[in-house]
UniProtKB/Swiss-Prot annotation:
Natural source organism: Mus musculus (Mouse)
Name of the protein in its database record: Atlastin-1
EC numbers for this chain: 3.6.5.-
Segments traversing the membrane: 450-470, 472-492
Modified residues (Phosphoserine): 10, 22-23
Annotated InterPro entries: G_GB1_RHD3_dom, Guanylate-bd_C_sf, Guanylate-bd_N, P-loop_NTPase
Gene: Atl1
Family: Belongs to the TRAFAC class dynamin-like GTPase superfamily. GB1/RHD3 GTPase family. GB1 subfamily.
């Protein structure tokens, strides 16, 4: 059974604290703090700490409550954890008018610090889930998530995309933390990350994500757009506006963002002051922060977390509980742990790939057009040696054309695309060989000729063996002859009607295999030998006495 107690906490107020961390049995009281639930390993793979998530989301007090998941994401070293700790102060002191606390008290909660190196990795969740009464009286669970900053020096683009996408998929309120302005590259990165998240989700006809809040820190143009939500709304409307005179690429970015989120808003926040930015020993005391920042901070946090602003997490229109959120967490991380999704690429890599693929396509098209001129559909049959010679010449020209195109990525990067070009040209050459062979009347007649030879040979052997009393062999030859005759008729019907083409291909392959057992001369020699044997056996069986004197000189002549 859960125990509750009112404790003075480090955020300057009193709050109800629950010590129930398990759905099965009571455990000792644990101090609330950040818990790493998504771990990014050194090999850039991802691991979910299911035990930690179970303790947080399956607590008896919250597991069946509908959940509001608030996440802060954005570039590293832009104050995300710093902001999260003020959210914690508000959640612990909502009933207090001066919820920001003592001006001399250090800021604690999620780990943060000044400097240029990253602090948070993966995804962290505050271990205590807050129970809040909404305006309609429904009690909901509020989960606070802090995320690893994007584009730090130790993370790949896939790391950044996965963490951002996963936090967006899990959260009902995603705060996109930006510095100074909303630039075009910020929107492009948002497009990439949200698309990476949408790929991992099941197909839905609804907008896949809920609330997106652009939080612009260190806003320096209050004379254009005032601090706060109103100025932010006007600024964002201008920034995300789609107009006809925009380039198609810019329009697509904005349309994509609008198609992904149900609600989009913006808040402009001033700079916290030089002491915060330059003092290496700054520990979050309010007395060192500019008054203008504190004034707007007192507006921002309630604007984000007040009961009327809390959006319950929904997936495909269904409200999600803490228990359900745990299952989605597990399902989503399995997708990102696998190889089903394409790996996102840097702009340079994507551009270099497109550049090289375009060069491959151009060179391949050149080869194709010139080979069509040599042995295309209306061209006569070309000797195989001449065709091969022309192929080698045009292949060399295509490779030279590929190498002559200016490409991004360097020689090493382009080498595999050169190999791809050569491989595709060789495949085209095989098709041209088949097309050229089909124009050869002797090649086209190979299948019926082979079948006729088989029929004739089996007919002769059947006659001879039947005559000398080897009825079993004769019957076998007759059966083979009959089957071959049926095969020949079937092949003729397939060629005439165009039906059962797969069966026709099998017949051609069998005939080709028989043909390849020997040249045409060898086949004719076998026919001649069979005929001569048949004639010799007939003379032995039916001697002609009157003819013997005349035959004797003939034998001598031979």
């Amino acid at each position: 059974m859960a125990k509750s107690r009112r404790d003075r906490n480090s955020w300057g107020g009193f709050s109800e604290k629950s010590s129930d961390w398990s759905s099965e049995e009571e455990e000792p009281v644990r101090k609330a703090g950040p818990v790493q639930v998504l771990i990014v390993k050194d090999d850039h793979s991802f691991e979910l700490d299911e035990a930690a998530l179970n303790r947080i989301l399956l607590s008896q007090a919250v597991r069946d409550k509908e959940v509001v998941a608030v996440s802060v994401a954005g570039a590293f070293r832009k104050g995300k954890s710093f902001l999260m700790d003020f959210m914690l102060r508000y959640m612990y002191n909502q009933e207090s008018v001066d919820w920001v606390g003592d001006y001399n008290e250090p800021l604690t909660g999620f780990s943060w610090r000044g400097g240029s190196e990253r602090e948070t990795t993966g995804i962290q969740i505050w271990s205590e889930v807050f129970l809040i009464n909404k305006l309609d009286g429904k009690k909901v669970a509020v989960l606070l998530m802090d995320t690893q900053g994007t584009f730090d020096s130790q993370s790949t683009l896939r790391d950044s995309a996965t963490v951002f996408a996963l936090s967006t998929m899990i959260s009902s309120i995603q705060v996109y933390n930006l510095s100074q302005n909303v630039q075009e590259d910020d929107l492009q990165h948002l497009q990439l990350f949200t698309e990476y998240g949408r790929l991992a989700m099941e197909e839905t006809f609804l907008k896949p994500f809920q609330s997106l809040i652009f939080l612009v820190r260190d806003w320096s143009f209050p004379y254009e757009f005032s601090y706060g939500a109103d100025g932010g709304a006007k600024f964002l409307e201008k920034r995300l506006k789609v107009s006809g005179n925009q380039h198609e690429e810019l329009q697509n970015v904005r349309k994509h963002i609008h198609s992904c989120f149900t609600n989009i808003s913006c808040f402009l926040l001033p700079h916290p002051g030089l002491k915060v930015a330059t003092n290496p020993n700054f520990d979050g005391k309010l007395k060192e922060i500019d008054d203008e920042f504190i004034k707007n901070l007192k507006i921002l946090i309630p604007w984000l977390l007040s009961p009327e602003r809390l959006d319950i997490k929904e997936i495909n229109g269904n409200k999600i509980t803490c228990r359900g959120l745990l299952e989605y967490f597990k399902a989503y991380i399995k997708i990102y742990q696998g190889e089903e999704l394409p790996h996102p690429k840097s702009m340079l890599q994507a551009t270099a790939e497109a550049n090289n693929l375009a060069a491959v396509a151009t060179a391949k098209d050149t080869y194709n057009k010139k080979m069509e001129e040599v042995c295309g559909g209306d061209k006569p049959f070309l000797a195989p040696n001449d065709l091969q010679s022309k192929h080698l010449q045009l292949k060399e020209e295509s490779v030279k054309l590929f190498r002559g195109v200016k490409k991004m990525g360097g020689e090493e990067f382009s080498r595999r695309y050169l190999q791809q070009l050569e491989s595709e040209i060789d495949e085209l050459y095989i098709q041209y060989i088949k097309h050229n062979d089909s124009k050869n009347i002797f090649h086209a007649a190979r299948t019926p000729a082979t079948l006729f030879v088989v029929i004739f040979i089996t007919y002769v052997i059947a006659g001879v063996t039947g005559f000398i009393g080897l009825d079993i062999i004769a019957s076998l030859c007759n059966m083979i002859m009959g089957l071959t005759l049926i095969t020949l008729c079937t092949w003729a019907y397939i060629r005439y009607s165009g039906e059962y083409r797969e069966l026709g291909a099998v017949i051609d392959q069998v005939a080709a295999a028989l043909w390849d057992q020997g040249s045409t001369n060898e086949a004719l020699y076998k026919l001649y030998s069979a005929a001569a044997t048949h004639r010799h056996l007939c003379h032995q069986a039916f001697p002609a006495p009157k003819s013997e004197p005349t035959q004797q000189p003939e034998k001598k002549k031979i």
